[in-house]
UniProtKB/Swiss-Prot annotation:
Classification via Gene3D superfamilies: Putative methyltransferase TM0872, insert domain (1.10.150.170), Vaccinia Virus protein VP39 (3.40.50.150)
EC code: 2.1.1.199
Organism: Endomicrobium trichonymphae
Keywords: Cytoplasm, Methyltransferase, rRNA processing, S-adenosyl-L-methionine, Transferase
Cited function: Specifically methylates the N4 position of cytidine in position 1402 (C1402) of 16S rRNA.
Listed SUPFAM superfamilies: Putative methyltransferase TM0872, insert domain (SSF81799), S-adenosyl-L-methionine-dependent methyltransferases (SSF53335)
UniProt entry tagged with the keyword NAD: no
Binding site for S-adenosyl-L-methionine: G31, G32, H33, D50, F77, D98, Q105
Annotated protein name in UniProt: Ribosomal RNA small subunit methyltransferase H
GO cellular component: cytoplasm
Catalysed reactions, as listed in the record: cytidine(1402) in 16S rRNA + S-adenosyl-L-methionine = N(4)-methylcytidine(1402) in 16S rRNA + S-adenosyl-L-homocysteine + H(+)
Keyword check for S-adenosyl-L-methionine: yes
Family the UniProt entry places it in: Belongs to the methyltransferase superfamily. RsmH family.
C-alpha cells in the first residue's frame, strides 16, 4: 500500500507550473506524491529517486500502475545531477523532495529508527555507510555531545554523552531500547515527547548525512531547472527548514529564484487529523527566473 502523501494539493500547486513536463521526485518513498501527481496531471512524467531498498521493491511490485510514466533510480538524491546526465536529461521542470522518515520506516523494527527497535542501524541505504550502533559505542564523549547538539539541538547533549560512556563500561549498547534507557536516566519526559527523540534524530541525520545531502541537492537544483521550473522542499524540523530558507533567500537575492512561499506552508487541521505525520511538515517553494 502506498503511503499517504503530505499536503498533496499544496505540493502540486507549487510544483506544477505549466502543462506537461518532466519532474524529479527525489524521495519516492511509498510513491504517494508520485501517484497523486500522475493522476492529477495526465501529461507529466517523473524521474523518481530513493536509496531505500524497500522503496525500490515497492516500485517494482507496482510498476505497471505508473504506465511507463515513471523512471525509478535507486540512489541518493545528492546524485540527481549525475544520474540525470546519465539519462541524457539536462533540464527538468520541477524538483520535489519530501525530507522525512516514513511511518513504514519507523514501524520496521529492523531499521533502528524507532525507540523500540531491536537494532541500532538507522541507515537509509544498508549498502553504504556505518550504523548508529558504531557511533554510540565507539565515538568519543566530545564527538557524541557535538552530534547530539548539532543535529538534534539537544540541550543536555553533554550529560547524555557522559551517561553513554558510563554505560559502555558495562558492555555494548546493542538496541534502540537500551539507548533509550540510558537517555531517560538523564532526561525526563516533556509532555508527550519521548526524552530520546532529539538524540535519535541526531543519530539518524548524522549516519545518513541528511543535511549535507540536502545542501548538495539545493546547490544543484537551479542548474537542472528550465526557466520557470520549480523547487519544492517539504521539511520536518528546523535544521532542514533553515537550510532551505537560506538557500532560497541567497538565490532570490542573486536573481536566480523567485520565492513562491513568503512564509512556510503547513498542513491544515483537517489533514493533521487524518494524517498526524503532517503536523510538523513545512513546504517552501521557489521558481527559477533565469535560464
Amino acid at each position: 500500500m502506498f503511503h499517504i502523501p503530505v499536503m498533496p494539493l499544496e505540493t502540486s500547486r507549487y510544483l506544477i507550473g505549466k502543462p506537461g513536463g518532466l519532474y524529479v521526485d527525489c524521495t519516492f518513498g511509498g510513491g504517494g506524491h508520485a501517484l497523486y501527481l500522475l493522476d492529477k496531471f495526465k501529461d507529466i512524467k517523473i524521474v523518481a529517486f530513493d536509496w531505500d531498498e524497500d522503496s525500490s521493491k515497492r516500485f517494482i511490485e507496482r510498476e505497471k500502475e505508473f504506465s511507463g510514466r515513471v523512471t525509478f533510480i535507486r540512489d541518493n538524491f545528492k546524485n540527481v545531477k549525475k544520474a540525470l546526465s546519465a539519462l541524457n536529461i539536462s533540464k527538468v521542470d520541477g524538483i520535489l523532495a519530501d525530507i522525512g522518515v516514513s511511518s513504514k520506516q519507523f514501524g520496521d523494527l529492523d531499521r533502528g529508527f524507532s525507540f523500540n527497535s531491536g537494532t541500532l542501524d538507522m541507515r537509509m541505504d544498508k549498502r553504504n555507510g556505518f550504523e548508529a550502533k558504531e557511533v554510540v559505542n565507539s565515538y568519543s564523549y566530545e564527538d557524541l555531545a557535538d552530534i547530539f547538539y548539532k543535529y538534534g539541538e539537544e540541550r543536555k547533549s553533554r550529560q547524555i554523552a557522559s551517561a553513554i560512556l558510563l554505560r559502555r563500561k558495562r558492555g555494548i549498547i546493542n538496541t534502540a531500547s537500551e539507548l533509550q534507557t540510558v537517555i531517560c536516566s538523564v532526561k525526563r519526559p516533556e509532555g508527550r515527547i519521548n526524552p530520546a527523540t532529539k538524540v535519535f534524530q541526531a543519530l539518524r541525520i548524522f549516519v545518513n548525512s541528511e543535511l549535507e545531502n540536502l545542501a548538495v541537492l539545493l546547490s544543484d537544483a537551479p542548474e537542472l531547472l528550465n526557466a520557470g521550473g520549480r523547487t519544492v522542499i517539504i521539511s520536518f524540523h528546523s535544521l532542514e527548514d533553515r537550510i532551505v530558507k537560506q538557500n532560497f533567500k541567497r538565490n532570490s537575492e542573486c536573481g536566480i529564484y523567485k520565492i513562491l512561499t513568503k512564509k512556510v506552508v503547513t498542513a491544515l487541521k483537517e489533514e493533521v487529523k487524518i494524517n498526524p505525520g503532517s503536523r510538523s511538515a513545512r513546504i517552501r517553494a521557489a521558481e527559477k527566473t533565469s535560464v
